[in-house]
UniProtKB/Swiss-Prot annotation:
Intracellular or extracellular location(s): Cytoplasm; Cytoplasm, Cytosol
Motif extent ('HIGH' region): 151-162
Name this polypeptide is given: Arginine--tRNA ligase, cytoplasmic
SUPFAM superfamilies according to UniProt: Anticodon-binding domain of a subclass of class I aminoacyl-tRNA synthetases, Arginyl-tRNA synthetase (ArgRS), N-terminal 'additional' domain, Nucleotidylyl transferase
Length: 607
């Protein structure tokens, strides 16, 4: 791999002076930062405004017709001056140098257009040498983040909310890693509670050892459904201690008291379920560092939490239950029960205990909970309680929320498990692929490709809009190769691969030393400008925690590549021109590959 100073060493090769480096900028790995530094430095000389105020005021444009960066003059807060007049004066005086093609005033804005020739000489070699590392940047030093995501309940369906948490959390974990954080991926399972008493009693009645080993998640769910049916049918006709409910309570009590025999069965259920989850998550390119769960929160931590609540004067009793009145700190937060009248703790207390345990163990710099927006109140109460307990690290907790998925069900009915969704997507994708007989005949492992493309369909549909928005799960739209879908991204990647294969006589070593000044067409210039944006897209995504930032960028990129095919031919050109164009396509494929991997997809080579 080339050194990360590649961009700056390239500047030296071109005998171009490097602009002064602004705070929090990374010009060695981000061309847009290099441009920001140049613009800030030069605009400061013209305007007399400090460059440290100009740098953060530079914004992305919403269309490339408005340039690559713009500055709204009102953001500089210059008293007594007309922003439109200043924009005109400063734009006229601005030196384009090697960096810019033109500078234009547009109302109270100045628009800066990067020089595509200059960009090509820096960006294309940078992408081709850094490969998978292009886009990554060490934004922080020695910082640790825990990301808790997915968190299904054992023996209950893995519903749409878990799917969204898994996809968004997987993306965030990859993003934080790319930008220099040490990431701990954590799955906090619903693996404790009275339902395990029910499961144990149910397993004695309806369990099957072979079925448990073969498919623990479905089998335990079937047992759970049947035992709940028994409870329903019994009603109040049997004395509590003889009833199914009574036996389940008694069993869970044994678990809570540490009875080895009771815990042995529970451990088997938990371990088998985790093994099955590991396989399913692997299909989404997710590997957890820690499988935690409600069961892992020690009794000591919860008792310590309740003692601390009392010590800080946060609690009061009501009919034997212990409550915390949070309205004193924020009227919207209401009152939270932390201990029931029978002395048992609630989910909230368990979460507080878990957070305390985690800080003790990992000393994280940040902890992110990827949980549905229905839990907004719960998360806000939980964070406020930790803050009022006096924990300095409470400010480092963040809730990344998301909306609902509507209409997710399979052919066989409405109870949905993640592996059912993935299997059905694979089958449907396979059916779609078979319709094109010629292409289908060329695919070496069609089922494997159908699986990867199908998974892309599910994931892109989920990440396409802002995460807070609800969306409808639509098979037809999702599996289409037309429009902005996962299969379209896969198709775009495989087509770029085929361009490379068809010109295999021109080696990748030649690409880096190509004459990029031959890339003169407007379509090529636009593509080069887009490729330079990728590192900045990642930095923007970490501010908003929005996967759609990356998804939208990848669709822009693939649409532009598609426009290039009509005008930038490789076949039948002189070797010099073919090499330059091939280098551009190779760089575009690398950036598309990097973006797809970041989102959790596996790009396919042929389809």
């Amino acid at each position: 791999m080339a050194s990360t100073a590649n961009m700056i060493s390239q500047l030296k090769k071109l005998s171009i002076a490097e602009p002064a480096v602004a705070k929090d900028s990374h010009p060695d790995v981000n061309i847009v930062d290099l441009m920001r530094n140049y613009i800030s430095q030069e605009l400061s000389k013209i305007s007399g405004v400090d460059s440290s105020l100009i740098f953060p005021a530079l914004e992305w444009t919403n269309t490339m017709e408005r340039g690559d960066l713009l500055i709204p003059i009102p953001r500089l807060r210059i008293k007594g001056a007309n922003p439109k007049d200043l924009a005109v004066q400063w734009a006229e005086k601005f030196p384009c140098g090697d960096f810019l093609e033109k500078v234009e005033a547009n109302g109270p804005f100045i628009q800066f257009f990067f020089n595509p020739q200059f960009l090509a000489k820096l960006v294309i070699p940078d992408i081709l040498t850094r490969k998978e590392d292009y886009g990554s940047c060490k934004l922080v030093e020695n910082k640790k983040v825990i990301i808790e995501f997915s968190s299904p309940n054992i023996a209950k369906p893995f519903h749409a909310g878990h799917l969204r948490s898994t996809i968004i959390g997987g993306f965030l974990a990859n993003l934080y890693e790319k930008l220099g954080w040490e990431v701990i991926r954590m799955n906090y399972l619903g693996d404790w509670g009275k339902q395990f008493g029910l499961l144990a009693v149910g397993f004695e009645r309806y369990g099957n050892e072979e079925a448990l080993v073969k498919d623990p998640i479905h089998h335990l769910f079937d047992v759970y459904v049947r035992i709940n049916k028994d409870i329903e049918e019994e009603g109040d006709s049997i004395p509590l201690e003889q009833s199914t409910n009574g036996k389940a309570r008694e069993y869970f009590k044994r678990m809570e008291d540490g009875d080895e025999e009771a815990l042995k069965i529970w451990k088997r259920f938990r371990e088998f379920s985790i093994e099955k989850y590991i396989d399913t998550y692997a299909r989404l390119n997710i590997k957890y560092d820690v499988y935690s769960g409600e069961s892992q929160v020690s009794k000591e931590s919860m008792l310590k939490a309740i003692d601390l609540f009392k010590e800080k004067g946060l609690t009061h009793e009501d009919k034997g239950a212990v409550l915390i009145d949070l309205t004193k700190f924020n009227k919207k937060l209401g009152k939270a029960i932390v201990q029931k009248s029978d002395g048992t703790t609630l989910y909230l207390t368990r979460d507080v205990g878990a957070a305390m345990d985690r800080y003790e163990k990992y000393h994280f710099d940040k902890m992110i909970y990827v949980i549905a927006s229905q839990q907004d109140l719960h998360a806000a109460q939980f964070f406020e309680i930790l803050k009022q307990m006096g924990f300095e690290w409470a400010k480092d907790l963040q809730h990344v929320n998301f909306g609902m998925v509507q209409g997710m069900s399979t052919r066989k009915g409405t109870v949905v498990f993640l592996d059912n969704i993935l299997e059905e997507t694979k089958e449907k994708m396979h059916e779609v692929m078979k319709k094109n007989e010629n292409k289908y005949a060329q695919i070496e492992h069609p089922e494997e490709v159908a699986d990867l493309v199908g998974i892309s369909a599910v994931m892109i549909q989920d990440m396409q809009g802002k995460r807070i928005n609800n969306y409808e799960f639509k098979w037809e739209r999702m599996l289409s190769f037309e429009g902005d879908t996962g299969p379209y991204l896969q198709y775009a990647h495989s087509r770029l691969r085929s361009v490379e294969r068809n010109a295999s006589g021109i080696t990748q070593e030649k690409w880096i030393n190509a004459d990029f000044s031959l890339l003169k067409e407007p379509a090529a210039k636009l593509l080069i400008r887009l490729l330079g944006q990728y590192p900045d897209v990642l930095r923007n995504a970490i501010k908003t925690h929005e996967p759609t930032t990356v998804v939208t960028y990848l669709f822009k990129l693939t649409h532009q590549v598609s426009s290039c095919y009509d005008v930038l031919w490789v076949a039948g050109q002189t070797e010099e021109l073919a090499t330059a164009r091939l280098a551009l396509y190779g760089a575009a494929r690398q950036v598309l590959y990097n973006g797809m991997r970041l989102l959790g997809l596996t790009p396919v080579e042929r389809m």
